[in-house]
């Protein structure tokens, strides 16, 4: 009974299948944790959604920014990006069912020994706050008001957490922290623009969210995706799993029990 955590799949379904074969994943005994961005620029987003959904309780999924964007496109709120290969989802007979399933997924998933989210956990949150914030947005996404939330979630402000944030300001910050965050300024403000590796950042105030000196201590390690430029990052406190399969990099997965890392190079599409 092993736990496998995989980085951003982004529709790279064939690579996922090879990776699961490589580690001899058994859906009857093992659990696959997916760190968000199931869909987008890879060639088989539809197949990816179908497969992960078919795993039932053997899959634990968190939402990424591309998954939320897919919902916005499905509602006509946003246009499909030119490089996204998600059109087959909308044309499929089970497209609505898959989108409904996706909308039920959380922003934060928790194991007794670790937590999984797409981009990270705000450095100003402890784990209890992160749980509560995730649940606030999750309940809205699962409600009849989800269109209102998706329609209004696109905004980089506010960029600093305050406990008294309310309404859209609160929801926007929560969504940005869980699904879009990479760098923060020294005072904890989120930077929504820089996507570079930390070694290439010249702005002295910018630092990865997980290295902020005043970051609140968490009870468990955080496993996340989203940041391909990190090219994989492993420390005692955080594990970054996005290694840019969709950018001709690789799909990376870790087995929690022995920390063995599995990697599948991107196939030529």
Curated annotation (Swiss-Prot):
Q: Which domain of life is it from?
A: Bacteria
Q: Which UniProt keywords apply?
A: Hydrolase
Write down the InterPro entries for this protein, in alphabetical order.
ApaH (IPR004617), Calcineurin-like_PHP_ApaH (IPR004843), Metallo-depent_PP-like (IPR029052)
Q: One MF term in GO for this entry? A: bis(5'-nucleosyl)-tetraphosphatase (symmetrical) activity
Which SUPFAM superfamilies does the record cross-reference, listed alphabetically?
Answer: Metallo-dependent phosphatases
- Class of the enzyme per the UniProt entry, highest EC level: hydrolase
State the EC number(s).
3.6.1.41
| Catalytic reaction equation(s) | P(1),P(4)-bis(5'-adenosyl) tetraphosphate + H2O = 2 ADP + 2 H(+)
- Which Pfam family, just one, is annotated for this protein? Metallophos
Q: Which Gene3D superfamilies match?
A: 3.60.21.10
The entry sums up its family as follows:
Belongs to the Ap4A hydrolase family.
Q: What does this protein do?
A: Hydrolyzes diadenosine 5',5'''-P1,P4-tetraphosphate to yield ADP.
- NCBIfam families per record: apaH (TIGR00668), PRK00166.1 (NF001204)
Query: What PANTHER family does the entry give?
Result: CYTOCHROME C5, PTHR40942
This protein's name: Bis(5'-nucleosyl)-tetraphosphatase, symmetrical
Q: Which organism is it from?
A: Vibrio vulnificus (strain CMCP6)
Source lineage: Bacteria, Pseudomonadati, Pseudomonadota, Gammaproteobacteria, Vibrionales
